[in-house]
Amino acid sequence: MAYKYLMILIATCTTVVYFIPYACNDFYNHFIDTYHITYGQAGDLLTFFGITAVIGYFIGGWVADKFNPKMLVVWSAILTGLAGTVVAFSTSFTILKIMYFLFGITSTCMHWSAFLKVIKNIGEDDEQ
């Protein structure tokens, strides 16, 4: 029974961690209107996120091996939520750039490899 709830918790954390950075893409026109930015600036935000995410994929495995993957999943969800809160209340494009850079770190470098490692460790040998 605990296995089921742990899987639900991990799936929820992963959904939150990956929804928040992509909200700019999902609600593109609303995002541009709300923050009074241009299409190019919105593209810049996703570029900052994308570059950081690509680098994060390369070092994320090392991070997941070096630190406790369960704690990485938890902390990545907390930090992504805090960064999302800053984005929600920010009116500065510079702050948005910093937060989208941080999203790349929290979602890929900290979360993705740790998430995969936690899922692997939860399963039995015959479930691999």
Regions found by a protein language model. Name each.
Residues 2-27:
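Pair of pore-lining "gating" transmembrane helices in MFS-fold secondary transporters
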Residues 22, 49-58:
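Residue-level signature of mid-helix packing/kink "hotspots" within the transmembrane helices
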Residues 23-36, 119:
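Membrane-interface helix caps of multi-pass secondary transporters
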Residues 56-68:
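Helix-to-loop junctions at the C-terminal end of transmembrane segments
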Residues 78-92:
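C-terminal ends and interior cores of transmembrane alpha-helices
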Residues 83, 94-102:
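Paired small-residue
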Residues 101-128:
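Cytoplasmic helix-loop-helix junction between adjacent transmembrane helices
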